Amino acid sequence: WMIEGEPSIDVWAMDVARFGDFATPGWGTIKSSENYERRFVMTFPNETLPKGRRQKTTALFDRFTSKGAVWDQGFGLENALWFAERPEDAHEDPTFHRSRAHKYVAREVKAVRENVGGIEIANYAKHEFKGPGSREFLNYILAGRLPRPGRINLTPMLTSKGKLYGDLTVACMEDEYFILFGSGLMQEAHRRWFEKRLPEKGVSYANRSDDYHGVAISGPKSRELLKRITRDDVTSGSFRFRDIR
């Protein structure tokens, strides 16, 4: 790492960028205690641990909880995994076999496939770039072609040795104004990556992950839902795939 500028193996498990401002000394004490208590306890797939939770929640947390949400957390932020029919049933039973979540997730998949469904996107990272030279800078650090204003592209971000360091959705709001959506868990690592490569003048960068919230809607009736909640023309001819407003 010191000689070649990047590690030759995956060292994410030892990277301090795994933690953000949610990882206070008190939180570290609680989680360390929890892990020590479980040192001889079997860990199951999809199992979530209860201590040190609710560091960050969104405006929809209480409403989702009342609707039977089962929660996990990523980078300190609570995010809904699936919904039970009743709040008292909102829990997972750890197992190596098919879990009780299966029927609930199947119901959600069927709803999105045949109708419309939504999911919070607060746990996606949002990186904002503004100012003269923003397009040139992003063209330099990203491997894919940047979109035109009002459009979205998906592009990888590579290291100097061609290794994948990020898979980002790039939204061009204006010619020199971009928002990059990426992994919430990697937001601190990506912030570090961007800031080390920013030019001295022109381009301003900010991590807006905690500032922007939203809901993604999908399904064959998603445009019908959009028509009910906005005055804009959201027909396929006016609001195309990969458009952004």
Where are these regions (language model features)?
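Glycine/proline-enriched, intrinsically flexible loops and inter-domain linkers
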Residues: M2-I3, P7-R245
